[in-house]
Structure formats: structure tokens, C-alpha cells
Amino acid sequence: CAMKGERSEKPDFSSLLSYGNEASMLDKLTTETEKEMQALREAKCRNDAEGLNALTHHLRSSWEILRADQPLRVLYRLLHGEGTPDNEALSHAVKGVLDKGAEIIRLAKEERRKYGHG
């Protein structure tokens, strides 16, 4: 079963925020994640496997820091498996990444409120 072993951990912002300037870091994370999720949606609509692969690679490094990269690993395995992934499996994997992206954005905005308007 593809779901076995998947962890649904909440993103962890502690490493990101350890550099200081928390409000700015959270704003940047939110803005960049929103752009990346839009690019992912567009690549999926175009059935652009190369684009999906490039975005997956790009997102993995930042999401690993947040300990939120599990959906990206699922998508990566699908894109790099034998043959062409079926559309339903690909849609499911992309949805997992989009859902995690939405969670990162939501939690980053919640965390951002702790730091006021500065």
C-alpha cells in the first residue's frame, strides 16, 4: 500500500527561525511556497513531468529543513520509477504536495502573527 510508512508530521519551523529575523523569514517562506504551489499546479495541468521533477528537486531542500518533505519523496519516487506513472497516481502525489504546501503556508501565517507587524 502506498500509504504505508507515510508520516504526516507538522512542519517544524525551528531550524528556519534559528537564524533570527523571524517575521521576514516566515513572510518569505509563505510567499515562495505560494509561488511554488502555483508552479506545481501549472506543471501538473500541462502534464509536464520534467517541470514536476525540477520543482520536486527545488522544494526538497527547503522542505527537508521543515521536516515536511514526505509528500515530495512520494512524488519523486513516482517520477523516477519504472515507466510512466499513471495519471491517477500522479494526481494523488501532486495533491499530497499541494496539501502539504497549503499546511506550510497556513502554519507559517499563524506563526508569523506571534512576531507582530515588524
Residue ranges of predicted features:
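Two-component system phosphorelay core
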Residues: 1-118
